[in-house]
């Protein structure tokens, strides 16, 4: 009888693991965390998730040398929507990427999406192997 009670608990314990390791959520891992260009960029801090699984999101940084942050957002949607991934903008700003001297400066705000958490952006950039050795300064 004890064995049957133990087995009845199994579905409740397995269900969260099924959600974590489903093929929908694995598609988030295939999205690069950082995509920025050299020089002065506008950037967005974006929380991505598969539709219906907002708890299991991932934060990414996207930047480009464009006229406004909406252009970056449009390119993010073009990249992610075919994969069934939703995007929520957490804010934006500017990044001065001096790749030759291995320095970066994160500052400013987006008029459209508001200010991003620049410290969080710095942590994401430093976790990325390309920018691990960079000296990254933040100005709020």
Curated annotation (Swiss-Prot):
Q: Which UniProt keywords apply?
A: Differentiation, Sexual differentiation
Q: What is this protein called?
A: Sex-regulated protein janus-B
What are the positions of the active site? 69
Tell me what gene encodes this: janB
Which family, according to the similarity comment? Belongs to the janus family.
GO molecular function terms attached to this record: protein histidine phosphatase activity
- Report the function annotation for this chain: JanA and janB regulate somatic sex differentiation.
Annotated Gene Ontology cellular components are: cytosol
- Gene3D superfamilies attached to this UniProt entry: Janus/Ocnus (3.50.20.20)
The UniProt record gives the binding positions of substrate as 42, 110-112
Q: Which GO terms describe its biological process?
A: cell differentiation; sex differentiation
InterPro entries for this protein: Janus (IPR007702), Janus_sf (IPR038596)
Q: Tell me yes or no: is Membrane among this UniProt entry's keywords.
A: no
Say if the entry is tagged with keyword Iron-sulfur: no
